[in-house]
Curated annotation (Swiss-Prot):
Main location group: cytoplasm
Species whose genome carries this gene: Thermomicrobium roseum (strain ATCC 27502 / DSM 5159 / P-2)
One GO biological process term: RNA processing
Residues of the KH domain: 565-624
Designated name of the protein: Polyribonucleotide nucleotidyltransferase
Family: Belongs to the polyribonucleotide nucleotidyltransferase family.
SMART domains according to UniProt: KH, S1
Domain S1 motif: 634-702
Recorded name of the encoding gene: pnp
Organism lineage string: Bacteria, Pseudomonadati, Thermomicrobiota, Thermomicrobia, Thermomicrobiales
């Protein structure tokens, strides 16, 4: 029988958002198709019926799949099928995960898997936001316990106006690109980048986005009313209050002494030792430590969980009531900062940023246009000239684990730090380099991603990259009392505050505004008022960090590292690209080989020349300019005859550029046959006598011969002072061969016999050629000699 299909629609930003269920994936616990424009995302959710034993976390996995057929593309590679998730897909999966995770019941240990599959992508409406809406709708319609639904929108700013769900092309001009997700009552997640927007403007954008989120939530509730399943019964595990009090009485003040220690290593060691002592005391029989309670005795896991709960309550209560943090700081106090730049001799730029026990080494490498990252995704094909990679090795936390590729966390942290610097990078016209930043976390105690932002800014300035302003980042925390409504905002949170607090709010920016932001929470949402207080406290912290950074380096270095490549950029006409490349790439390869450079040419005629030193790059520039410049009337060239036809000859005057020498312009006297005077391969002096609109060049040899004859006649007469003048030999460019012989072909030169006993021939002193005169030889090296023509 045909499926029963239910759908609800709402207009968002002038386009119809449709959520549909019942058509596909009927065996999933929840499945929806979300359409917006011509972008379609299928999101499914499946939950296990039984909890996973022996774990202390919620086993939620979120996958985001980009199918290349969605954009009408065939995947690359040998197998022509999708492989591992792209970086964009991983970021979209994390974006989907964060707003739905806080709404699962506390203590829920059943495995849940959410999969969003992009089925159609119109390259205008971004599918990542639809994935959040789809995950929420699928969970809402399923029987899995969940306290949703949530809605999500993207917000931008064009011409001073806030725009909901801007298209991909509008985002290119937008001052902000921020995704906001939340329930009907509160904000759950914020992530994005901006071009130095103020804190007030950011709050305004979030409030505007929340208005649309409420409408999206209402649509899901309407759909749930007609197509939702009854929720499974779930009873959260209850704490053993009596046992918990016994453990607290046993510990006394020793728990505070262990937890409140400014040194993370000592705190972890003391807390772990105390935890083992408590377990040994309350679970004396070792076999019972891993089994089910017998005779009223608890298990080791139960005692350990109660100990962890006491630690959490102690930290949160002390922060709320006394304003004291585990390391002794006040809520708005930043840890001690120590900075060093230029500590690595060979990399192009480096910075070591240390904040408390968090330490990050960031290294900057400058590359060429060809080293840009190609983004093969469902969207607009593009390349990326600025990259930031984040590495989190196990020794940074004193742990041991296998070294593998970057984790999802590594990719997410790297992307956040990357977005933070985009607003201050120089344009490609100003700085035509590819920039790769790598942040190595050497020691971790919270806020490593924001330390990477600071390190990136410092390393770029150390490398001489002309960023407009330095950027700093700080991570904010939150501790709330759900009963009284009291809350305390923490500046520069450390690891224990991140783990036991309610929020991780990362804010990066310059002195003038926010450039990147990311907010994750563990409660049911926060209000704009809390967010406003957190942003103001973050602004003060950011300015403090920027002051510390400016004490070490306050502006980009005037010179780049001597080990960095030198890149020059010139512009040629698109129709001249073929002249520079040459047949089969012969010309451009010759230039690169002779000058030691790398040359890349864009479709619009932009040419990038990179070399180990600037002199080599400028030699290549001069050669390209010779290839592409249009000769002017009156210029004299020393060219080679390449083709002879009855009406004249074609003479190569520049590499790949020929001019036509008509038979009447070969000599002053009448020439019956071109071959009587010229031979293919003969090198002659010619003058440009005309350039046609289509670029064709007319040459004359006769004009030069007549001029030489007139000069010889003038110099044959004795001057008034009685001295005689010797005839002056015609000057030729450096490296030219024997002078032209007229009228017949040049006499071939016999090769010299060389041997061990024959001394090397002395090098002749090269003469300086007259202005506008060039010789085209077999080797570009002769053209690019030490004595360049003026």
């Amino acid at each position: 029988m045909p499926p029963i299909i239910h759908e609800r629609s709402i207009e968002i930003a002038g386009r119809l958002l449709t959520i549909e269920t019942g058509r596909v994936a009927e065996q999933a616990d929840g499945a929806v198709l979300v359409r917006y424009g011509e972008t379609v995302v299928l999101t499914t959710v499946v939950g296990a019926k039984q909890p996973v034993e022996g774990i202390d976390f919620f086993p939620l996995t979120v996958e985001y799949e980009e199918k290349m057929y969605a954009a009408g593309k065939i995947p690359g590679g040998f197998f022509r099928r999708e492989g591992k998730p792209s970086e964009a897909a991983i970021l979209a999966a994390r974006l989907t995960d964060r707003p739905i995770r806080p709404l699962f019941p506390k203590g829920y240990r059943n495995e849940v898997q959410v999969i969003s599959t992009v089925l159609s992508a119109d390259q205008e409406n971004e599918p990542d936001v639809l994935s959040i809406i789809g995950a929420s709708a699928a969970l809402t319609l399923s029987d899995i316990p969940w306290y949703g639904p949530v809605g999500a929108v993207r917000i931008g700013e064009l011409d001073g106006e806030l725009v909901i769900n801007p298209t991909s092309h509008q985002l290119l001009e937008s001052r902000m690109d921020i995704v906001v997700a939340g329930t009907a009552d509160a904000i759950l997640m914020v992530e994005g980048q901006a071009n130095e927007i103020s804190e007030d403007r950011f709050i305004e954008a979030v409030v505007r986005a929340h208005q649309e989120i409420k409408r999206i939530v209402a649509v899901q509730l309407e759909l749930q009313a007609v197509a939702g399943k009854p929720k499974r019964e779930f009873v959260p595990p209850q704490e053993n209050v009596e046992l918990k009090q016994q453990i607290a009485d046993y510990l006394g003040d020793r728990l505070r002494e262990a937890v409140f220690n400014p040194d993370k290593t000592l705190r972890v060691q003391a807390t772990a030792a105390l935890r083992e002592e408590v377990i040994a005391h309350f679970v004396p029989n070792e076999p019972l430590a891993i089994g089910t309670p017998q005779s009223g005795l608890p298990t080791a896991k139960e005692v350990g969980d109660l100990f962890d709960s006491l630690v959490k309550e102690l930290v949160r209560r002390t922060i709320l009531e006394q304003g004291e943090r585990p390391d002794g700081r006040k809520p708005d106090e930043i840890r001690e900062i120590w900075i060093q730049v230029g500590l690595l001799p060979r990399p192009h730029g480096s910075a070591l940023f240390t904040r408390g026990q968090t330490q990050v080494l960031t290294v900057c490498t400058l590359g060429t246009k060809e080293e840009e990252q190609f983004l093969d995704s469902l969207g607009i094909e593009e390349t990326k000239r600025y990259m930031h990679h984040y590495n989190f090795p196990p020794f940074s936390t004193g742990e041991i684990r296998r070294l593998r590729g970057p984790s999802r966390r590594d990719i997410g942290h790297g992307a956040l730090a990357e977005r933070a610097l985009l607003a201050v990078l120089p344009s490609e016209d100003e700085f035509p380099y590819t920039m790769r930043l790598v942040s190595e976390v050497l020691s971790s105690n919270g806020s490593t991603s924001m330390a990477s932002v600071c390190g990136s800014s410092l390393a770029l300035m150390d490398a001489g990259v002309p960023i407009r302003k330095p950027v700093a980042g700080v991570a904010m925390g939150l501790v709330t009392d759900q009963t009284t409504g009291r809350y305390t905002i923490l500046t520069d949170i450390q690891g224990i505050e991140d783990a036991l607090g309610d929020m991780d709010f990362k804010v990066a920016g310059t002195r003038d505004g926010i450039t990147a932001i990311q907010m994750d929470i563990k409660v049911m949402g926060i209000t704009p008022e809390i967010m406003r207080d957190a942003l103001e406290q973050a602004r003060r912290g950011r300015l403090f960090i920027l002051d510390k950074m400016s004490e070490v380096i306050d502006a980009p270095r005037p010179e780049m590292s001597p080990y960095a490549p030198r890149i020059l950029r010139i512009k040629i006409k698109p129709e001249q690209i073929g002249e520079v490349i040459g047949p089969g790439g012969r010309v451009i390869r010759a230039i690169q080989e002779q000058t030691g450079t790398k040359i890349s040419i864009e479709e619009d005629g932009t040419v990038f020349i990179s070399a180990a030193n600037e002199d080599a790059a400028r030699r290549a520039v001069r050669e390209i300019e010779r290839l592409t410049r249009v000769p002017e009337v009156g210029e004299i060239f020393y060219g080679r005859v390449v083709t002879i036809i009855p009406s004249g000859a074609f003479v190569e005057i520049l590499p790949g550029k020929d001019g036509f020498l008509h038979i009447s312009e070969i000599a002053p006297e009448r020439v019956r046959s071109v071959e009587d005077v010229l031979k293919v391969g003969q090198e002659i002096n010619v003058m440009v006598i005309g350039v046609r609109p289509d670029g064709k060049i007319n040459l004359s040899r006769k004009a030069l011969l007549e001029k030489e004859a007139a000069e010889r006649a003038a110099t044959a007469q004795a001057p008034a002072d009685g001295r005689s003048h010797q005839p002056r030999a015609p000057q030729r460019p450096s490296g030219t061969a024997q002078p032209e012989r007229r009228p017949g072909p040049p006499t071939p030169r016999r090769p010299e016999q060389r041997g061990p006993s024959r001394p090397p021939r002395p090098q002749a002193q090269r003469s300086t050629p007259p202005p506008g005169q060039y010789r085209i030889g077999d080797r570009l090296k002769e053209l690019l000699g030490e004595d360049e023509p003026n």
